């Protein structure tokens, strides 16, 4: 990795806790005023940004937490677990059921705030995606040919997509008669991302590669060369770059000037032979955060390749990474249960 003399931000601008269980996911609520960490022991830890000394532990799932998302409303979260529960965590720390799928795992959750009270919640359970309104009333079930492995709404909330074996499927959420668009490519697809302008989707594949489809003309996009499986995908705010894990650097593919076909990606913060496990593009600027298998966390400027060290390689492999909506806070968690929030807001 590029050498730098700057101190790690964890020591100068961070607050952390040892939570004693694998950090499955971390997210900020839509207001950006609170962060949540979902753990492998079924608990969810909440932290108000205005009071980061106070970490609240909630017992949310009877088994492991498997998925976490901000809710449709500003101050709540949605979680899924291997106890079959899809649950809402309220701004007052109250936990309530949206749905109970009993013995079936809720492995993927997503939400969209919608307009004028028309927010949507989605849960991936086996081969089905369940769609709920913001009040938790079930709207429809969307079937897939195999287990859902990734789930995301597009930017406008008009479509939802899921990855699965042999491809991905896109659905219009408001369609009275569901006629999904099926995107086919043989193999095991394990993660899913939608381009910010809605014209492309990308999946990670079991065979250490990415596959994409340009929706306007069906053009396939193949992105390969990874030494490990890609677990994390993140488009930059304007969709110019797709950041990905799975190599000993953050790998960014160009999605401008016709897309990534025939073009080499750029690699940031690489060279040490340690696999990048998580990426998170900044929501406002051309920057990307990356977490590595040795616990290192860095922030990279895409245009200059300048690297800012966030956390040293001391606390276990990075398993979760997320920005607040305004990009002033960065949260991360590790397989060893270490969790932290970095304050990047301007200081007087």
Give the positions of each predicted feature:
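WD40-repeat beta-propeller superdomains and closely related acidic/aromatic-rich repeat-like regions
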Residues: 1-348
């Amino acid at each position: 990795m590029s050498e730098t003399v700057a101190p790690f931000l964890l020591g100068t601008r961070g607050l952390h806790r040892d939570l004693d269980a694998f950090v499955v996911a971390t997210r900020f609520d839509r207001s950006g005023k609170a962060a949540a960490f979902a753990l492998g022991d079924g608990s969810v830890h909440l932290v108000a940004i205005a009071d980061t000394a106070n970490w609240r532990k909630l017992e949310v799932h009877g088994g492991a937490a498997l998925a976490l998302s901000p809710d449709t409303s500003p101050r709540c979260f949605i979680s899924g677990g291997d106890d079959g529960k899809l649950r809402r965590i309220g701004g007052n720390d109250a936990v309530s059921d949206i749905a109970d799928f009993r013995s079936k795992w809720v492995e993927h959750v997503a939400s969209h705030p919608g307009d004028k009270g028309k927010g949507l919640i989605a849960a991936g359970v086996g081969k089905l995606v369940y769609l709920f309104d913001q009040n938790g009333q079930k709207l429809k079930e969307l079937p897939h040919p195999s287990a859902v492995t990734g789930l995301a709404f597009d930017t406008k909330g008009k479509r939802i997509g899921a990855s699965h074996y042999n491809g991905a499927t896109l659905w219009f959420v408001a369609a009275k008669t569901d006629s999904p668009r099926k995107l086919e490519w043989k193999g095991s697809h394990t993660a899913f991302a939608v381009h910010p302008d809605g014209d492309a989707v990308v999946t990670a594949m079991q065979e250490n590669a990415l596959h994409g489809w340009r929706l306007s003309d069906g053009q396939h996009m193949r992105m390969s060369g990874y030494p490990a499986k890609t677990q994390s995908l993140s488009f930059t705010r304007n969709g110019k770059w797709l950041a990905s894990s799975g190599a000993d650097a953050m790998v960014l593919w160009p999605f401008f000037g016709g897309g990534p076909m025939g073009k080499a990606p750029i690699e940031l913060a690489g060279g040490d032979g340690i696999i990048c496990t998580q990426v998170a593009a900044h929501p406002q600027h051309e920057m990307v955060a990356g977490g590595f298998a040795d616990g290192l966390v860095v922030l990279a400027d895409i245009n200059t390749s300048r690297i800012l060290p966030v956390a040293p390689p001391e606390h276990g492999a990075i398993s979760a990474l997320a920005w607040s909506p305004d990009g002033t806070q960065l949260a991360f968690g590790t397989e060893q249960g270490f969790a932290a929030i970095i304050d990047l807001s301007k200081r007087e």
